[in-house]
């Protein structure tokens, strides 16, 4: 690891003189621990609004991945607002700084799947109150679309996540006739965000071929090394 000067990092942010004196006094060019501490001190802390129509303890890959993402962001000092539908069961593994709950509607014939109702005024007021640095939309359903419009109205950058090939498996949910409109909508949705996160290089390539032209960034799925290790 290359050495990062203490002076350079301290200039990035206003610290009390006592902090600066301590770090200068204990400066050690071979101290990886010191570099780590300094990086943590100067890392920007963001206010992030996360919008999703699925959330733990629902059992699916998107809900589980999102839970781990929120835990990781909060551990790094970021402040999280969660906008999601009301659920029958409560998640006990994570507590957001703020939550905005909207009414939920089950998908016909699939009671375990639901989407959030487009309560624009409620969502807009929640975003305005939290004043996030960015709004990250995980799902592209009615709630996600509502959040997109609300964030744009407040001139807040919007990022999105592409987690499920809904336009593919919709063929198996009696929605075959809607595949083309769904494809067009998903392409339009993600092209109206400043960034779309994807789980793999394969998905990134597929979205580019699909016509998504906004910047795409691979955010791989991690492994809990406490539970899973050699």
What residue spans do the PLM features occupy?
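Structural motif
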Residues: 83, 137-138, 161
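N-terminal subdomain of nucleotide-sugar transferases
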Residues: 2-101
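Nucleotide-sugar donor phosphate/pyrophosphate-binding loop at the beta->alpha transition
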Residues: 157-159, 167-188, 225
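Short, hinge-like loop/turn segments at secondary-structure boundaries
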Residues: 97-103, 153-155, 175-179, 214-216
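Donor nucleotide-sugar binding/catalytic pocket of nucleotide-sugar-dependent glycosyltransferases
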Residues: 84, 100-103, 183-230
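Alpha-helix capping/helix-boundary segments
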Residues: 88, 142-143, 202-204
């Amino acid at each position: 690891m290359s050495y990062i000067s203490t002076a350079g990092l301290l200039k990035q942010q206003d610290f009390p003189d006592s902090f600066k004196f301590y770090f200068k006094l204990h400066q050690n060019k071979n101290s990886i621990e010191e570099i780590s501490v300094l990086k943590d001190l100067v890392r920007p802390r963001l206010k992030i609004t996360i919008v999703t129509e699925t959330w733990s303890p629902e059992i699916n890959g998107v809900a589980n991945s999102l839970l781990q993402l929120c835990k990781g962001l909060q551990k790094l000092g970021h402040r999280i607002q969660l906008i999601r539908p009301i659920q029958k069961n409560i998640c006990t593994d994570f507590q957001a700084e703020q939550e905005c709950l909207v009414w939920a509607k089950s998908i016909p014939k699939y009671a375990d799947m639901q989407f959030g109702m487009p309560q624009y005024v409620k969502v807009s007021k929640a975003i305005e109150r939290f004043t996030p640095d960015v709004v990250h939309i995980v799902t592209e359903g009615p709630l996600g679309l509502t959040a997109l419009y609300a964030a744009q109205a407040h001139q807040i950058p919007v990022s999105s996540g592409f987690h499920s090939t809904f336009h593919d498996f919709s063929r198996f949910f009696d929605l075959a006739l809607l595949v083309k409109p769904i494809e067009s909508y998903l392409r339009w949705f993600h092209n109206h965000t400043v960034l779309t996160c994807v789980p793999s290089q394969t998905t990134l390539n597929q979205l580019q071929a699909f016509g998504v032209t906004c910047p795409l960034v691979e955010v791989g799925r991690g492994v809990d090394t406490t539970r899973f290790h050699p």
